[in-house]
Amino acid sequence: MATALVLGYSAFDLGLFSDKDPRLKLIKKAIRKDLEAMAADGVSWLVFTGSLGFEYWVLEVAQEMKTEYGFQLATIFAFETHGENWNEGNQMKLSRFKQVDFVKYAYPRYEHKGQLRDYQQFLLENTTSSYLFYDEENETKLAYFYQKMKNQEDYFIKRLTFDELNELAENFSEN
């Protein structure tokens, strides 16, 4: 049973502030293509951390593909308090992360930074791969986690990059 941890840029990181942004159609097309390939490679579980942006878009696409491809979806939040201060629209998105096949919380609440380190280590040790929208030239807080992934023995990283999106956009506009 192959499991993939899903992580990537937030909507804010990408400057996408509307669910109707036309760039989302292209991003979701890339996600669908990647998820089809991952399913063919035997990935059956997708594990989320409950972040908005790339993770949420993967969740949306995976839920559409769930019946046909047999994906199982899990959300492992760092804290039970995750997202409690989000606005109503984001609370609705958070609820979708809670309506998956498996939901757990690592800790009741944040107490010290060691919890985040241990949480990340737990995620790495309990997944066999990751699906990551991240480009080293556009660093964010994911840089540290990405380094940990690269150092994890026998850990496969499937990355979606800006170059891939640009290539898809060129082909998309030609058709």
From Swiss-Prot:
It holds the Pfam family YpsA. InterPro entries: YspA. It comes from the Bacteria. Belongs to the UPF0398 family. This is UPF0398 protein SP_0371. It comes from Streptococcus pneumoniae serotype 4 (strain ATCC BAA-334 / TIGR4).
